[in-house]
């Protein structure tokens, strides 16, 4: 049994009693990376020397019994800036970017005395659902190396599933935590928009982006969200909501819970194996005293279309800062200012990023703004209202995290429309801004299936309670890939 088979709480107790040391945990992490990283490719940059240095300092000082995460190894998605540790967003244009400050979540993790093992691979600028658009390399799913780990936080999910780190941070703009968590058989939480500061997150779509935790089990996830949540003066969209002790909600008691199951989430396009795993999960929840009804989120069909208009529009604005002038890649072939812009961006961005910048620029252009961007915003309002309506009568909404299990590497990369359509069950949650968690709920042909539990605004505690109750009745979260 490896050290990462223990939970956060178990490892904390061992550290406090000095049965193990932070140095042991960091060694476990790097030994595992040495063993499997060539197969999975979870990381872009390793932080080995600094990680061992922090581990030794913490070991000498002793672990604070009240600091649950102290001494535990974490991986951080490479679009979250880390002071003096290369942060690339998996793009050539930021290949050698060395940030001069920490993201708020990184500062919070340092205060919690976690140990940063390194920066995790992702789709370039978080644009993708497979971690195939990374400038550096593709990441492979630990359950089947011929398949994708999901995206855009593919490295964050694969590193946890492969046992390279105990837990990780990802970001979720349209499903980028929940879908890879589902594909890799781990737990991923997309918090309410504004629950976690975005300061230091390299922006893709500012009205949709949210940082969240990826872990092996629900309890660990709750501890990690506690550590990174809270109001931040540096982020005007962070919300002044008390930081709850999410771990206190894990009572196992969900008697009387009212579940809404959208007919749109189990209809055409959902793999039979995925649908069956979700229906079996609902039976488990019924045994625990919950009830469920079929409900409707009638405007879900507009989710993907409106999401890709809005996200691409915001990206076209956010990514205009990468021009070769102040930081990042600069084309050596430019002789005029105009060439500096065009060549730097043409050479520095990958195909998917350029596709979305062009789509967003088109949607915002004067002749098409009303037809596309304005209409997408109107659809977003309707989608948001759908959730408000259902939550008047139900406590949570449940469906699959993804309509399929992990697909083959190179299977969709040249078919962007099919790839985009795969986000159909996750993007409405980001458009509405509500929280959702993906937990392992079974297997289909040997590949993990994720159960998506969606809550009302700032009801992460309830999501953790439901997810934990389900987890305690099943063993899916204990299954590990054979690497």
Swiss-Prot record:
Of the GO CC terms on this record, one is: glutamyl-tRNA(Gln) amidotransferase complex
For this UniProt record, give its keywords in alphabetical order, as a comma-separated list. ATP-binding, Ligase, Nucleotide-binding, Protein biosynthesis
**Tree of life domain:** Bacteria
Positions annotated as active site in the UniProt record: 77, 152, 176
- Kindly indicate whether the keyword Ligase belongs to this entry: yes
| Entry keyword annotation includes Transferase | no
Q: Name one GO biological process term.
A: translation
GO terms (molecular function) for this protein are: ATP binding; glutaminyl-tRNA synthase (glutamine-hydrolyzing) activity
UniProt cross-references to InterPro entries, sorted A to Z? Amidase, Amidase_CS, Amidase_dom, AS_sf, GatA
Q: Which reaction does it catalyse?
A: L-glutamyl-tRNA(Gln) + L-glutamine + ATP + H2O = L-glutaminyl-tRNA(Gln) + L-glutamate + ADP + phosphate + H(+)
Q: Which PANTHER family does the record match to this protein?
A: GLUTAMYL-TRNA(GLN) AMIDOTRANSFERASE SUBUNIT A (PTHR11895:SF151), TRANSAMIDASE (PTHR11895)
According to the record's subunit comment, the protein's assembly and interactions are: Heterotrimer of A, B and C subunits.
User: What does this protein do, in the record's words?
Assistant: Allows the formation of correctly charged Gln-tRNA(Gln) through the transamidation of misacylated Glu-tRNA(Gln) in organisms which lack glutaminyl-tRNA synthetase. The reaction takes place in the presence of glutamine and ATP through an activated gamma-phospho-Glu-tRNA(Gln).
Say which family it is in: Belongs to the amidase family. GatA subfamily.
Query: HAMAP family, per this entry?
Result: GatA (MF_00120)
Name the UniProt record assigns to this protein: Glutamyl-tRNA(Gln) amidotransferase subunit A
What is the gene called?
Answer: gatA
